[in-house]
Curated annotation (Swiss-Prot):
Protein name: Protein translocase subunit SecA 1
UniProt function note: Part of the Sec protein translocase complex. Interacts with the SecYEG preprotein conducting channel. Has a central role in coupling the hydrolysis of ATP to the transfer of proteins into and across the cell membrane, serving as an ATP-driven molecular motor driving the stepwise translocation of polypeptide chains across the membrane.
GO biological process, alphabetically ordered: intracellular protein transmembrane transport; protein import; protein targeting; protein transport by the Sec complex
Cofactor(s) essential for the protein: Zn(2+)
Keyword terms: ATP-binding, Cell membrane, Cytoplasm, Membrane, Metal-binding, Nucleotide-binding, Protein transport, Translocase, Translocation, Transport, Zinc
Binding site for ATP: 85, 103-107, 493
GO molecular function: ATP binding; metal ion binding; protein-exporting ATPase activity
Translocase found in the keyword field: yes
Encoding gene, per UniProt annotation: secA1
Matching InterPro entries: Helicase_ATP-bd, Helicase_C-like, P-loop_NTPase, SEC_C_motif, SecA, SecA_CS, SecA_DEAD, SecA_motor_DEAD
Ligand binding (Zn(2+)): 821, 823, 832-833
Pfam families, per the entry: P-loop_SecA, SEC-C, SecA_DEAD, SecA_PP_bind, SecA_SW
Subunit record text: Monomer and homodimer. Part of the essential Sec protein translocation apparatus which comprises SecA, SecYEG and auxiliary proteins SecDF. Other proteins may also be involved.
Catalytic activity: ATP + H2O + cellular proteinSide 1 = ADP + phosphate + cellular proteinSide 2
């Protein structure tokens, strides 16, 4: 282990030396750029663009381009990037993460790689965690970019599609991570190319990259529509049952935060819901409601995991920032279960139309980089998942903050008593204090204690985050006391007021350790910016979540033997033990995120295929007849091959039914037409006849443009419907294969194999529906604005009719389980009408 650490440190030192040499080359242009007039300096942008278009690489332009930005920043912003900022900019251009401490000027650092990469004309996305930071940075740094001749756009959730498109067309676009993700998903749901807002994803520079790519990595962005099934009553019933349970009726795993019914709980469920066996296959849906009710009531905590707004809505609290996540809802029914628990209106369940995780969204960029002050602890994950390194950048001035050893108390009560005494003492001498908490509940509790102690203060948490920037900006003033959840105003510097340096600078007090060392380091990093003095102190108790999860029993015995109920233990060894516990949690969380990615990669591969084909259809300015006719041909082949092993009479009858109900006019084909033909000849006969029907169908449309429109909308509507169902099916499959792990099967391998088979089935089903709708749609001449509505409703009506289109006199008992269903769904019999037998 020591050798590994030594190697890592040596590699970092070597990288720093290399970056220093590159920064020196930038500095060599300093006098040359300073000698230019404003117009001459601005003209450099046009020169660089021309050189790039003529084949020169961005790497070769780096030194001059960075020098231009430095000089431009000095003239426009009154800021002149330091050497360490230039070094950080080089790391960003190379697609890595520079770890730069709080207050080292990351926003100014970003201007150099952003400018350089914008010269390509392919677009640069500067990604922030909230819209306040997007607007602030776009306004402040946009002044520099505009002066240098580059266009700057801000992409906000409130903007119209046209405004969004204009923002994305700019050389540099500022946006939040969630809005980029939702725009990507919505772009892949439109029917016309002109309604897409994004260009191909080129270069993303992510601010607070650890928050977005690590903390929110598992968060799926979901575009959804309403589910047709009414389920609110079931949520209320499950909630009522769960609230009636005793502690012996369920089992909670504190470490993994999972919960399940005990034997007595199962007995009570069977009695409550009047069931013989709770885990019978027909009760799968009910067990899902019960599982969610258990999680909602005994795992999810009010004012920690979520808050109830004044509008009686459940708002999720981000565990890493403490902010409420507006517009976000827990998936898979958990949100509705919490609504039932809290007695607020239950909103309709939704069906996912499109989804993507941040892991897969940002891996789609040609180049990805980001900035953070605390990335080294997650270097393995950055490297393994995103193929980017974390390079620690030296501070411009030495860090003077004093980080005290942790203080450990026996109880939460004695811990908070000590916190209040410490805050009061510092307040009385005028030293500003920032108290960091992990939950809204804790910040409210400390606030009440400080009020009782006569200490005026500000509270910053999920309930009043709209005042975040204002509160944080004043947190470094003399006598200021600020209580903040983990959000702690990331992105907003705390500047020290007059006379505060002499008092020791800002003191950061942590009220418990987070499960991630990185979050603790972020809190510490609020103090001691740019060489300022400062202090940090963490107060812990044996009753804290982290301590309970990892061995507080032994320490509890020490407190009892020494009779130290009100006193603290302080030692470096204790701090190391806590950090070792945090490493174990971080390792568990990383393993979980890695497994999520393995599952999500299955959907990623399938999504890329569907979206690529969809894009090809949307952007096609051609007759799509070859594509549709190929689908018709493959559909015919699947149906004929699917009945190859049946008896001749049964086979011909099934193929005839398929042709009548899905392919040709009912009275245009008879059994005699198919008798005596080989399977190959049947395929050819049906295909040739279908081509005539196809020509007849398109001849009813007004002109060539109407044909293209009809073809395009037809394909897209079928693809979108099938893809939505497929997403839902994959989600159900994922839940199902988890249980197969108990049978010694690898659930990920099972998911990959089954998901691949389901995808192929979906492709067949898409081609079947396109065939049937193309051949059976009742086409009328329509004006263009109405054409989309017409085909959409026709498709919906035909799909509904198709689901019931089984000939009444057909003997289903003679059909093999793996043969295609004769109803024409394109599914195997066992997965269609065979389910009902």
């Amino acid at each position: 282990m020591a050798n590994i650490l030594k190697t890592i440190i040596e590699n970092d030192k070597g990288e720093i030396r290399r970056l220093e040499k590159m920064a020196d080359k930038v500095f060599k242009y300093e006098d040359q750029m300073a000698a230019l007039t404003d117009d001459q300096l601005k003209a450099k942008t046009v020169e660089f663009k021309e050189r790039y278009q003529n084949g020169e690489s961005l790497d070769s332009l780096l030194y001059e381009a960075f020098a231009v930005v430095r000089e431009g920043a000095k003239r426009v912003l009154g800021l002149f990037p330091y050497k360490v900022q230039v070094m950080g900019g080089i790391v960003l251009h190379h697609g890595d993460v520079p770890e730069m401490r709080t207050g080292e000027g990351k926003t100014l650092t970003a201007t150099m790689p952003v400018y350089l990469n914008a010269l390509s004309g392919k677009g640069v996305h500067v990604v922030t965690v909230n819209e306040y930071l997007s607007e602030r940075d776009a306004t402040e740094m946009g002044e520099l970019y505009s002066w240098l001749g580059l266009s700057v756009g801000i992409n906000l959730a409130t903007k119209s599609p046209m405004e969004k498109k204009e923002a994305y067309e700019c050389d540099i676009t500022y946006s939040t991570n969630s809005e980029i993700g939702f725009d990507y998903l919505r772009d892949n749901m439109v029917v016309r190319a002109e309604n897409m807002v994004q260009r191909p994803l080129n270069y993303a520079l992510v601010d607070e990259v650890d928050s977005i790519l690590i903390d929110e990595a598992r968060t799926p962005l979901i575009v959804s529509g309403a589910n047709a099934v009414e389920t609110s009553q079931l949520y209320h019933m499950a909630d009522h049952y769960v609230k009636s349970l005793n502690k012996d009726d369920y089992i909670i795993d504190v470490q993994s935060k999972t919960i399940g019914l005990s034997d007595s709980g199962i007995d009570r469920a069977e009695s409550y819901f009047k069931l013989e066996n709770l885990y019978d296959i027909e009760n799968v849906a009910l067990t899902h409601f019960i599982d969610n009710a258990l999680r909602a009531n005994y795992i999810m905590l009010l004012d920690i995991d979520y808050v109830v707004s004044e509008e009686q809505e459940i708002l999720i609290v981000d565990q890493f920032t403490g902010r409420t996540m507006e517009g976000r809802r827990y998936s898979d029914g958990l949100h509705q279960a919490i609504e039932a628990k809290e007695g607020v209106p239950i909103q309709d369940e939704t069906k996912t139309s499109a989804s993507i995780t941040y892991q897969n969204l940002f891996r789609m960029y040609k180049k990805l980089s980001g900035m953070t002050g605390t990335g080294k602890t997650e270097e393995e994950e950055f490297r393994e998942i995103y193929n980017i390194r974390v390079i620690p950048i030296p501070t411009n001035r030495p860090v003077q903050r004093i980080d005290h050893s942790d203080l450990l108390y026996a109880s939460i009560e004695s811990k908070f008593k000590a916190v209040v005494e410490d805050v009061k003492a510092r307040y009385q001498k005028g030293q500003p204090v920032l108290v960091g908490t992990v939950a809204v509940e804790t910040s409210d509790y400390i606030s009440k204690k400080l009020v009782a102690a006569g200490v005026p203060h500000e509270v910053l948490n999920a309930k009043n985050h709209y005042r975040e920037a204002q509160i944080i900006m004043n947190a470094g003033q003399r006598g200021a006391v600020t209580i903040a959840t983990n959000m702690a105003g990331r992105g907003t510097d705390i500047k020290l007021g007059e006379g505060v340096r002499e008092l020791g600078g800002l003191c950061v007090i942590g009220t418990e350790r987070h499960e991630s060392r990185r979050i603790d380091n972020q809190l510490r990093g609020r103090s001691g910016r740019q060489g300022d003095p400062g202090e940090s102190q963490f107060y812990l108790s044996l009753e804290d979540d982290l301590m309970k999860r990892f061995g507080s029993e032994r320490l509890k015995g020490i407190f009892e033997r020494l009779n130290m109920s009100e006193e603290a233990i302080e030692s470096r060894m204790l701090t190391r033990q806590v950090e070792a516990a945090q490493k174990r949690v971080e390792g568990n969380n990383y393993d979980t995120r890695k497994q999520v990615l393995q599952y999500d990669d299955v959907m990623r591969e399938q999504r890329e295929i569907i979206y690529a084909q969809r894009y090809d259809v949307i952007t096609a300015d051609r007759d799509l007849a070859p594509e549709i006719q190929s689908m018709i041909k493959r559909t015919i082949e699947r149906v004929v091959d699917g009945h190859a092993r049946a008896k001749q009479d049964e086979k011909l009858e099934a193929i005839l039914n398929f042709a009548k109900y899905n392919l040709l006019p009912e009275d245009s084909i008879t059994m005699e037409d198919l008798s005596g033909l080989s399977d190959k000849a049947i395929k050819e006969e049906l295909f040739q006849r279908s081509l005539k029907v196809y020509d007849s169908q398109v001849s009813k449309l007004r002109d060539e443009e109407a044909v293209k429109e009809f073809q395009k909308v037809l394909i897209l509507r079928v693809v979108d419907n099938k893809w939505t169902d497929h997403i839902d099916a994959l989600d159900q499959l994922r839940n199902a294969v988890g249980l197969r792990g108990y049978a010694q099967n690898n659930p990920v391998v099972e998911y990959q194999a089954e998901g691949f088979r389901m995808f192929n089935d979906m492709i067949g089903s898409i081609e079947f529906d396109v065939t049937r709708l193309m051949m059976k749609a009742q086409i009328h001449e329509q004006e263009r604005p109405q054409a989309e509505r017409h085909i959409s409703t026709t498709a919906t009506r035909n799909i509904a009719a198709h689901q019931a289109s089984m000939p009444e006199d057909l003997d289903l008992s003679q059909i093999g389980r793996n043969e295609l269903c004769p109803c024409g769904s394109g599914k195997k019999f066992k997965n269609c009408h065979g389910k009902r037998q």
